Amino acid sequence: MSKRRYLTGKEVQAMMQAVCYGATGARDYCLILLAYRHGMRISELLDLHYQDLDLNEGRINIRRLKNGFSTVHPLRFDERKAVERWTLERANWKGADRTDAIFISRRGSRLSRQQAYRIIRDAGIEAGTVTQTHPHMLRHACGYELAERGADTRLIQDYLGHRNIRHTVRYTASNAARFAGLWERNNLINEKLKREEV
């Protein structure tokens, strides 16, 4: 079994596809999507309430734990659609009107950590991920994906709510793409300096 501690973007997509057609598919898909895209810890995810969302403006308020910085993130179009789909289905669940928590169980109570863990673990198994999947891997997947896309370390730090940049550096340190073009850029500078000397 691999020691990798994060999921790739493709693995997360496979997990979302694996859950989307089950009896709780709308909820599970939305849960995995938001956890991944916003790099949420499981407690932050399960503490989300409808008052934290503004679907019209496309924003989500992330209340970070562990003394992290809380932030407002943009909600992308597919995230809004996933929340809307889940909200429509959720309204038909027994006891759904008793709580404002976004993610609830079939009994209408807020989803527990154990239930969320099981959903994510089972989605990983169903998707055939190369490593045993748990909720925090979605947070790491977010950080690594942002680094892979060229996001600055400080921006990733803010996005994930890290107080200490040491926790963020792991994502950018292993990203070889950050060195792409380094020699070409330096060559251009050297060429410019040579032309100015002449």
What does each model-identified segment do?
Residues 1-198:
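Conserved catalytic core of the tyrosine transesterase superfamily
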